[in-house]
Amino acid sequence: MDADDFGKKDLENGNESPKKPIFMKDWKNSQPNEQGRWLHLDARMNRNIEDLEISNYNLRLMNEQLESQLLSLNVKPVVSFAEQGKSSESKTDEEGFILNSASNVLDNFISIVNELVQHAEDVLDDLG
């Protein structure tokens, strides 16, 4: 019995609105009243996607703020034209130093967060 036979059988029995089973390949194209539980699944998936998009947006904002703070900390005074002709090795060394500094800051931040989590767990253990 395919979907068309199912609808014909309902019409033969006197039902006014033929109901067809919904197959996964075309459930998004069905009418809302025919989708039944698939509407709920679609709504949950949309909500998950929206949550991920919001998280992504917030993380991008945080990243931009951290980058701007890093740039503001590393602002250097104007140098003469002769000093601008540095070798590529010294520029690479400076970039490595900046990356290493940023890595150290992130490591310190992670260790602080880990300590806070550990302290919170200790407090919860004491209360429980």
Curated annotation (Swiss-Prot):
Positions of the UniProt region annotated as Disordered: 1-30
TM annotation in the entry: none
Entry keyword set: Cytoplasm, Nucleus
Main localization, broad class: cytoplasm
Bias type Basic and acidic residues, positions: 1-28
Compartments where located: Cytoplasm; Nucleus
Gene Ontology cellular component list: cytoplasm; cytosol; nucleus
Domain of life: Eukaryota
Keyword Transmembrane helix carried by entry: no
Entry protein name: Uncharacterized protein C24B10.03
Organism phylogeny: Eukaryota, Fungi, Dikarya, Ascomycota, Taphrinomycotina
